[in-house]
Amino acid sequence: MKIKEVIEEGKNALSKNNIEDNVIIARELLAFVLGVTKQYLVIHLEDELSAEDYIKFKENIDKIINGKPLQYITNNQEFMGLNFFVNENVLIPQPDTEIIVEETLKRCEKLLLKNAKIKILDLCTGSGAIAISL
């Protein structure tokens, strides 16, 4: 089966189960299974997929359909332009949280202009996305 056909099949399975962003998820999962970038997939749409990789892809599509977040399958979440390792033991960093980081940085900048000392404490908060981003 060709890469483009596998992506289409994954997209259709996700769509049938009312999962939004089905094309994006199908591409991300296939790139993850193959260990390549999403750009690679676009360039190699006509390449054949091995049976083993196809099975892994289908298993991951089923995990998504059964409610497992994409980030827990790929163990990755982008946050503030950085990639963070995530698994079931941590919360997935959310885009809304980026607003908190941006506001904190603005306030810290104002304090630094006044030569104030700044201390930020972030303990046991999961992936460390907030503290690392600050």
Regions found by a protein language model. Name each.
Residues 99-134:
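Conserved SAM/SAH cofactor-binding pocket of Class I
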